[in-house]
Amino acid sequence: MNRFVGVLAVAIVGWFANATCAQSVDVATLVEQLRQGGYVIVMRHGGTNRDQADTDPLNPENVAKQRLLSESGRAVARDVGSAWRKLGIPVGVVYTSRFNRAVETGRLVGGVDVKSTDDVTEGGLVVTPIENDRRAEALRKLAATPPPAGKNTLIVTHKPNIIDAFGRDWFEIKEGEATVFKPDAAGKATSVGRLQAADWIKTSAAR
């Protein structure tokens, strides 16, 4: 088991550089870079109702049996989307989990139609360990895929997927928190910053 964990850690490091838990980031500078496109933003879905649970996790279409965005979570996601548009952050493709809280976050933040996929959908204990590993690998590949010129890719997923893909540094990732990756031509990506929802909103308000 220890050997397996070591191999997995090496594999993650091989995909990503500078992926640290407490990256200090100049938000204004990062926004200017995002305005040029070329980044992948991996976001945990927005704030949810804490008195709800996914009671039918095998059927993501069954929205009534899911933990959904709270009213405040929905409002914050909408404000983040407005901030992105005010800041001039161009969004190309938006990939989301099939669960409604991720789909809704993607639409509100990205402002475009979303592509829901099993690749970034939380599997938890209802899919096999092999399938969870496949989804982690798929998320890493998406984060390391350069977007179309002049655009940024948004991926809205879940805490377990993010931890599985990028490591334990993301154990405390909050709802609505985003990690910005810079893909390169070699098929790898560098984590260049982690931002809370409030960071986008405050930066936009200061303009």
Where are these regions (language model features)?
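Histidine-centered catalytic micro-motifs
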Residues: 43-48, 155-162
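Sec/Tat signal peptide C-region and signal peptidase I cleavage site
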Residues: 18-22
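Glycine-rich phosphate-binding loop signature in dinucleotide/nucleotide-binding domains
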Residues: 87-89, 146-150
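A short, acidic, amphipathic alpha-helical segment used as a generic capping/interface helix at domain edges
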Residues: 136-147
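Active-site-proximal alpha-helix that buttresses catalytic centers in soluble enzyme cores
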Residues: 24-119, 123-127, 133-135, 169-198, ...
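Generic beta-sheet signal
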Residues: 38-40, 148-157
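Positively charged n-region of N-terminal signal peptides that target proteins for export
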Residues: 1-4
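Bacterial N-terminal signal peptides
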Residues: 7-16
